């Protein structure tokens, strides 16, 4: 049973609409869908939305992406949650924009936020929802790319992806991870 949905991103207005903040975007949408307490609380280095009707919290770590593990560890401790009871939502360069993948566990795949979580909580055994953002043409452009906003053309598809990710998470909360995989794992292009 999932007890915390953790959307990864970078805090601050500067990063609000960037590719790296897809996790935050999904977290906001889910919090709205579940009618969570909109007055987030600063706890565990995160903005926490409490959703008492669903016995789940939505967290947006405020540690910056590369230090996400610190926030996740504090969430686990403060809320007495096991790694298997969190769902981490984040951007994935290796998936095209429009792809969504739900996984029970796995490696970091080179994602620094996930790497930080794995290194800090000492396990890869936590569920995650990967949101494809595509990859830039040149490898040296990766950091600029993930910190750039979506183009006007991409925004149309992004809205569909965010809606699908929201539905996926609602499904996970209702039916669990394994029963939700077929519904969640899609390419929307």
From Swiss-Prot:
GO biological process, one term: rescue of stalled ribosome
Keywords: Cytoplasm, Hydrolase, RNA-binding, tRNA-binding
Active site: residue positions: 20
Top-tier EC class: hydrolase
Residues reported in the UniProt entry to bind tRNA: 15, 64, 66, 112
An annotated Gene Ontology molecular function: tRNA binding
One Pfam family from the record: Pept_tRNA_hydro
InterPro entries per UniProt: Pept_tRNA_hydro, Pept_tRNA_hydro_CS, Pept_tRNA_hydro_sf
Record-listed E.C. numbers: 3.1.1.29
Compartments (UniProt record): Cytoplasm
Gene3D superfamilies: Peptidyl-tRNA hydrolase
Main localization category: cytoplasm
The reaction(s) this protein catalyses: an N-acyl-L-alpha-aminoacyl-tRNA + H2O = an N-acyl-L-amino acid + a tRNA + H(+)
Residues the record marks as site: Stabilizes the basic form of H active site to accept a proton: 91
Site, Discriminates between blocked and unblocked aminoacyl-tRNA: residue positions: 10
PROSITE patterns, per the entry: PEPT_TRNA_HYDROL_1, PEPT_TRNA_HYDROL_2
GO cellular component annotations of the record: cytoplasm
Purpose of the protein: Hydrolyzes ribosome-free peptidyl-tRNAs (with 1 or more amino acids incorporated), which drop off the ribosome during protein synthesis, or as a result of ribosome stalling.
Stored HAMAP family: Pept_tRNA_hydro_bact
Family: Belongs to the PTH family.
NCBIfam families: pth
Subunit structure comment from the entry: Monomer.
Protein name in the entry: Peptidyl-tRNA hydrolase
């Amino acid at each position: 049973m999932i007890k915390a949905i953790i959307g990864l991103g970078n805090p601050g207005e500067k990063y609000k609409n960037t590719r790296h903040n897809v996790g935050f975007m999904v977290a906001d949408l889910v919090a709205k869908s579940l009618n969570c307490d909109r007055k987030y609380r600063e706890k565990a280095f995160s903005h926490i939305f409490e959703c008492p009707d669903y016995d789940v919290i939505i967290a947006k770590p405020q540690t910056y992406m590369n230090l996400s593990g610190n926030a996740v560890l504090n969430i686990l401790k403060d809320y007495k949650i096991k790694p298997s009871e969190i769902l981490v939502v984040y951007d994935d360069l290796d998936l095209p924009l429009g792809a969504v993948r739900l996984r029970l566990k796995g490696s970091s795949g080179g994602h620094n936020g996930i790497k930080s979580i794995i290194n800090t909580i000492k396990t890869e055994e936590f569920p995650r929802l990967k949101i494809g953002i595509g990859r830039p043409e040149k490898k040296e452009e990766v950091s600029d790319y993930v910190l750039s906003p979506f183009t006007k053309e991409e925004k149309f598809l992004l809205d569909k992806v965010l809606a699908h990710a929201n539905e996926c998470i609602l499904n996970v909360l209702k039916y669990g991870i394994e029963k939700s995989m077929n519904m969640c794992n899609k390419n929307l292009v």
